[in-house]
Amino acid sequence: MTEPLQRRRVLFVEDEPALRFSYERFFRNRYELSFAATGAEAIEQLHAARPDVLILDMRLPDTDGVDLLRRVREERPELPVLVTTAYVSMEPRLRVLDLPFQGYLIKPFELRDLGDRIDALG
């Protein structure tokens, strides 16, 4: 007897309630979801939810996304991270800081595209 496929656990770190709502509505049947609105909540969820993928908004109310990404890399270096931001100029900054991430989406983007990127992570 084959075991059922386990849904991928995705942690969305996003401070905008409307976007969290959109993510939840669009992806709730596709992934096991958890959410954080601040960097502090993100670290809590990183431990509690043990996500397979992290979707990280770079602008948060309590921390800089780069600092949070650095902390994530210290705690979970293997965790795939997709960065989302409205700032077009963030990618070069992240590359210079040598903080690896697996993808970059500039807001606004299509949720379908985000799902395709998550699925492509393997």
Where are the model-predicted features located?
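Conserved acidic carboxylate
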Residues: 14
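Two-component/phosphorelay signaling modules centered on CheY-like receiver
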Residues: 17-34
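Acidic, metal-coordinating helix/loop segments flanking the phosphotransfer/catalytic sites
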Residues: 35-53, 74
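Acidic catalytic/metal-coordinating carboxylates
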Residues: 38, 64-67
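Alpha4 helix (beta4-alpha4-beta5 surface) of REC/receiver domains from two-component response regulators
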Residues: 67, 88-105, 116
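C-terminal output helix
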Residues: 109-119
